[in-house]
């Protein structure tokens, strides 16, 4: 709490939190900000700061996650004690009228057994306090609250604070796009500090990340080098609706930081380069740089690690090569990554003599593949994963040659599919160029046989997406689909009774055979593992990207329609190939009709209906992402959305409220779903009667309902066959590429 009344000189006792183990780094950072009386604590530091100093901490810290102003504390022996302790705080004097709030509750004990209960009791105390004072009841806002209250229950003692930072300070606000496994921004800053980047930058050294992803290390490196306050790109802070906030003082702190940024960007120059083999993430990195106005400061290029070398257009002052390579979760991935680490280290040794080389990895065993001796090691956490930063000094070429390692052996023997070109750079062979084993030859031959069988259908129907293999050989259990010239492999996870190493080896064989048979280079192979999931779990993301991203998609032609397909981020791609015949049937029958698509996914059937001449359509799904995807599918085909609506809703709720009539309905629900977004659990075997019956209630006379399910044990209820005219059209809705898997789905045509 404050110790003086004058706002400009009032000292606030604050707790500035950070990741465990960073306390020393954070203490040094705050002392450099001229914040006095800094004392290290557990996962943070205690400081005494003026209002202006508090603003500077929020704006300038590269390491902290929260800035908390402690308010009160008390013992918790019963659930009601939470309300009692929180009620001791004079909330009306702390929160501006009308401010929304959120309570972050951490910790439990015998009286408070879950954090939701604790948060609710604190919230009740805040609301009661404000209402008793005659104030307006504050709204609870989970995403972007005006005021965040931090409640921590530790050793039966509840500590209440107001969160002056708001959203976690690692969220700088510049991340427009991201790759598959982005580093948190404050973690990237901590890695750079531990690697010695500030000193290297002061000496004019360069910064280079050969596997830069969406550019977090590069951006944080630039912010450090140019002394740019990381908080300048944030839209909102937690203190803005705190009554102690002084807008004039805050504006001055911000303006001072902007002046420093502008001056340094004009007067200083640093060489900062980032490369990545993934074209899409380099575009994401460029967008993130542009968000900060650093597009002319940070240079991004699409380049694999095998081609890593210093820029040829200028001589760089030796600096820092820092990298966060993949660490691998599967045996095959780890084995492949050993080669990646070897190549990375080889290129650094060849090209960056006299530089500092830093490798951050969650698999320290892979770091050994560099065959370098670390000057220092620092332990970190990357999310929940233990990780380590290895910092090396790159020896001269002569010194490096004194140490023989297996890297050289790999180059000479070409056993692992690598070759060394005339310039000494390493080039990794594509999987499709490597010699086939006997087992991989069998797989390749089976796929070639399937391609030959499908050739006529592909040509006649102009297929651009089709299945070429579906666990044809039981020991090689996967589905392989071809989209244009890109290959999508979904491995069916092996039963627990199968030895994991054996299953892994079989899958590597399958992948090799597929790559050769389809002549697909590595950058056109996309591999997923399909596990036994419930409901729409198959739709879950494989990466951390957010929403629909056209740059990560390709266009696939289906009849007259162009459809977006994403091979990278989800287990399924946005286009269920087995439903192709049903979509084409809907296309033919939709002319002049009103079409309803329930559980619409990416609304590909709705696009076909619209292009087939449907007068109107309604597509219903609960997922914002898939409705955004559907919107883009419509726009790709120049379909106006005024008459083709996309509705985000629970399909059961929507059906119960629907008073419209439709001529053509597609019902393709998941087998099971217990999504929190749904009002009830969906089990298609149990719920088929009420779901189909409700659809028939809104089906116009002479209309058709197409009901489809992927549940292999599904049995159509006799009530449906008795009430309506039902025709099993499953066989007619399975094309040649799925004939080997006739139970891929069942489909019925249902009419009055």
From Swiss-Prot:
CDD domains: AdoMet_MTases (cd02440), THUMP_AdoMetMT (cd11715)
Source species, domain of life: Bacteria
Gene3D superfamilies in UniProt: 3.30.2130.30, RNA methyltransferase domain (HRMD) like, Vaccinia Virus protein VP39
Enzyme Commission code: 2.1.1.173, 2.1.1.264
Every THUMP domain range: 53-164
Subcellular location: Cytoplasm
Molecular function GO labels: 23S rRNA (guanine(2445)-N(2))-methyltransferase activity; RNA binding; rRNA (guanine-N7-)-methyltransferase activity
Main location: cytoplasm
Function summary: Specifically methylates the guanine in position 2445 (m2G2445) and the guanine in position 2069 (m7G2069) of 23S rRNA.
Stated name of the protein: Ribosomal RNA large subunit methyltransferase K/L
Organism: Saccharophagus degradans (strain 2-40 / ATCC 43961 / DSM 17024)
């Amino acid at each position: 709490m404050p110790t003086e009344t004058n706002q400009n000189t009032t000292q606030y006792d604050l707790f500035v939190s950070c990741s465990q183990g960073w306390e020393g780094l954070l203490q040094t950072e705050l002392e450099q900000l001229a914040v006095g009386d800094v004392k290290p604590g557990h996962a943070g530091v205690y400081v005494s700061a003026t209002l202006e100093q508090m603003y500077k901490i929020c704006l300038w810290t590269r390491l902290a996650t929260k800035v908390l102003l402690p308010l009160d504390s008390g013992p918790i022996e019963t659930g009601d004690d939470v309300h009692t302790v929180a009620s001791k705080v004079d909330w009306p004097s702390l929160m501006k009228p009308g401010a929304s709030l959120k309570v972050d509750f951490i910790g439990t004990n015998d009286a408070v057994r879950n954090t939701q209960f604790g948060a609710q009791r604190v919230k009740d105390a805040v609301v009661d306090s404000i209402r008793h004072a005659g104030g307006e009841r504050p709204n609870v806002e989970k995403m972007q609250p005006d005021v965040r209250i931090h409640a921590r229950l530790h050793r039966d003692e509840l500590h209440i604070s107001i969160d002056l930072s708001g959203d976690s300070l690692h969220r700088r606000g510049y991340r427009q796009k991201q790759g598959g496994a982005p580093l948190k921004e404050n973690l990237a800053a901590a890695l750079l500090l531990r690697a010695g980047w500030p000193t290297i930058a002061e000496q004019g050294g360069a910064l280079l990340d050969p596997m830069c992803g969406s550019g977090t290390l590069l951006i944080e490196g630039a912010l450090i080098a140019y002394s740019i306050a990381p908080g300048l790109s944030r839209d909102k802070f937690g203190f803005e609706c705190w009554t102690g906030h002084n807008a004039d003082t805050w504006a001055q702190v911000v303006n001072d930081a902007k002046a420093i940024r502008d001056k340094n960007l004009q007067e200083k120059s640093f060489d900062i380069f980032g490369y990545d083999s993934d074209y899409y993430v380099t575009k994401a990195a460029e967008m993130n740089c542009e968000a900060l106005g650093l597009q002319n400061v940070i240079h991004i290029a699409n380049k694999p690690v095998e081609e890593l070398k210093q820029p040829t257009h200028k001589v760089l002052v030796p600096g820092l090569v820092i990298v966060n390579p993949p660490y691998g979760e599967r045996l095959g991935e780890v084995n492949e990554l050993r080669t990646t680490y070897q190549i990375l280290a080889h290129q650094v040794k060849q090209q960056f003599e006299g530089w500092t080389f830093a490798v951050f990895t969650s698999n320290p065993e892979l770091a050994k593949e560099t065959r370098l001796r670390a000057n220092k090691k620092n332990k970190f956490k990357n999310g929940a994963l233990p990780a380590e930063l290895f910092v090396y000094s790159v020896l001269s070429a002569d010194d490096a040659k004194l140490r023989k390692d297996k890297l050289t052996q790999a180059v000479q023997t070409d056993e692992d599919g690598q070759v060394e070109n005339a310039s000494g750079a390493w080039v990794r062979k594509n999987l499709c160029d490597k010699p086939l084993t006997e087992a991989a030859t069998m797989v390749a031959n089976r796929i070639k046989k399937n391609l030959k069988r499908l050739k006529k259908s592909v040509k006649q129907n102009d297929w651009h997406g089709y299945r070429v293999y579906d666990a044809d050989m039981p020991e090689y259990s996967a589905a392989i689909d071809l989209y244009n010239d890109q290959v999508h492999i979904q491995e069916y996870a092996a039963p627990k009774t199968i030895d994991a190493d054996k299953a892994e080896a079989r899958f590597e064989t399958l992948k090799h055979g597929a790559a050769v048979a389809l002549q697909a280079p590595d950058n056109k192979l996309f591999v997923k593992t399909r596990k036994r999931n419930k409901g729409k779990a198959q739709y879950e993301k494989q990466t951390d990207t957010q929403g629909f991203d056209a740059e990560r998609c390709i266009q696939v032609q289906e009849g007259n329609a162009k459809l977006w397909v994403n091979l990278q981020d989800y287990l399924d791609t946005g286009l269920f190939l087995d439903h192709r015949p049903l979509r084409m049937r809907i296309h033919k029958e939709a002319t002049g009709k009103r079409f309803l698509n329930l559980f619409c996914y990416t609304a590909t059937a709705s696009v076909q209906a619209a292009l087939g001449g449907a007068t109107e359509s309604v597509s219903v799904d609960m997922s914002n992402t898939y409705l955004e995807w559907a919107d883009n599918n419509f726009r790709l085909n120049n379909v106006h959305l005024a008459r083709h609506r996309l509705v985000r809703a629970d399909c059961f709720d929507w059906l119960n409220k629907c008073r419209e009539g439709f001529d053509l309905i597609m019902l393709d629900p998941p087998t099971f779903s217990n999504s929190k977004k749904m009002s009830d659990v969906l089990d298609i075997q149990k719920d088929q009667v009420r779901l189909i019956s409700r659809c028939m209630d809104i089906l116009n006379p002479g209309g058709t309902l197409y009901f489809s399910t992927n549940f292999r044990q599904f049995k159509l209820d006799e009530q449906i066959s008795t009430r309506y005219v039902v025709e099993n059209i499953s066989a007619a809705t399975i094309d040649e590429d799925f004939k080997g898997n006739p139970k891929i789905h069942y489909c019925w045509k249902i009419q009055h």
